[in-house]
Amino acid sequence: MNTNVTIAGVTFKNPVTTASGTFGSGMEYSEFVDLNRLGAITTKGVSSVPWPGNPVPRIAETYGGMLNAIGLQNPGVDMFVERDLAFLKQFDTKVIVNVCGKSVKEYVEVVERLSEEAVDLLELNISCPNVKEGCIAFGQDPKMIAMIMDEIKRHAKQPVIVKLSPNVTDITEMAKAAEAGGADALSLINTLTGMKIDINHRAFAIANKTGGMSGPAVKPIAVRMVYQVANAVKLPIIGMGGIQNAEDALEFIMAGATVVAVGTANFINPYATVEVIEGIEEFMRKNQISDINDLIGCVK
């Protein structure tokens, strides 16, 4: 039974990774799961210098999910390389580093700093909805996406994945722009912009006012967008958005995703990623499927 999948020449032992920002770099989760079991680990967003993130409160629960406005808090790329990448080197698991920035220059600085490191792929975060500078401002303009990709590809040594925002009129236009700019793969969806009001205090539940919504409630939207993008471009896709179990993951794969990312479920169940992998393998055995690749985009 073959569970290997390939994105931009990089082969994953299985089609399951973690969604950026929900798993750190795996340090805490390594106490619960064998990180060697994962197809890949996608790290939290990394910028050129430390980012403090947004003011608190910055997380709120919703029906079927959560809102977050963390603001891509991180220690900066130098500390990330020294601490996080050093930790990840001990595992036989592919490493995808999520790159964020407030300007094209900052994206380039991070990409150049990582060019000689043990990183398999870069995920360009141009779609975080709760960072006022960069990120989402770039991800909603197809011309800007193509321009950023063209610039990043001049400096990147690793294949580049572009993470797409669902907060657009037509996500396929953004996907086409990323493809035209030279992207090697796409990941989608990032979180949907949402809001919650604390009626007792007559105030916003999150200091940032709005936050990114994730969790099971967004899954039907995410599956639909993966299907649309898979039929609009020729790039491989990492699908995500509300995956809780193997059945959810298989929906994304059948819609056209080569790899799936488990996100918010990690906060509820630290074993979620491994359980998704085991569930996919069980589905393949039960249905006598010899190659996971036969399921990718099988629903037309």
Curated annotation (Swiss-Prot):
Q: What residues make up the catalytic site?
A: C128 (nucleophile)
Q: Which keywords does the record carry? A: Cytoplasm, Flavoprotein, FMN, NAD, Oxidoreductase, Pyrimidine biosynthesis
As recorded in UniProt, its EC number(s) are 1.3.1.14
The catalytic activity, as recorded, is: (S)-dihydroorotate + NAD(+) = orotate + NADH + H(+)
Essential cofactor(s): FMN
Q: Which residues bind substrate?
A: K44, N68, A69, I70, G71, L72, N125, N190, T191
Full protein name: Dihydroorotate dehydrogenase B (NAD(+)), catalytic subunit
